[in-house]
Amino acid sequence: NRHLAEAISIDLEEAFVDYNDVMSRIEEIIKVSINAVNDYIKNNPDSEFTPTPVPESIPRYTYDDLVDRMQKAGAKTEWGDDLYPSNLKKIGLDGFYFITDWPLGPKPFYVKDSKSNPKISESFDLMFGDLELSSGSTRIEKRDELAQRMSNKGMKTDSFEYHLNAFDYGVPPHAGCGIGLERLIMALTGTENIRDTTFYPRDVDRLTP
């Protein structure tokens, strides 16, 4: 009820910021979006949607903190594992929140590592309960570092020369994210099935229309 074969991603990229700044941008987007939906509900009393309280701020939990909570709750998880929805349910988090500072290993090649710990990434996921809405990070801006990360992940840098060449001209420090539009609509409206958030849902059982 949360996956589509074809989905819309809202991509944000900004120069001279890091992942903390991007989380702040997302927080602003969430507040504006909640207010817009609440205004619609107010002006359409027959709507089936329920107003959502606007949070003063969106909590930020580190990956390490949540792994510790899960283990104390009896979940079978270790450092480095993904945080599966079934385990997130065991610690009872609800509403909007961020999970920050994920292990670097499984992250994409362009994600920057932490200055204080090279095993940790400057990254985050935006969650709504156990539903992932967004992933973002500080990006690598240096060509040599990016090429090395590609090699470390077994990627052929020759195949990405067109991308690496852009970094020869200088790329500023930057960060960004992608937000799943249909999942965001689920969170804002209380919709339980992602198929109900898009006009022509496409999944493993339906390609047309």
Give, region by region, the residue ranges found by the protein language model:
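Residues forming anionic-ligand binding surfaces in small-molecule and nucleic-acid pockets
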Residues: 1-16, 123-125
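A generic structural motif
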Residues: 11-22, 130-132
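A residue-level signal for conserved active-site and pocket-lining positions in enzyme catalytic cores
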Residues: 12, 66, 99, 136, ...
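Short loop/turn segments at secondary-structure transitions that flank enzyme active sites
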Residues: 18, 67, 105, 132, ...
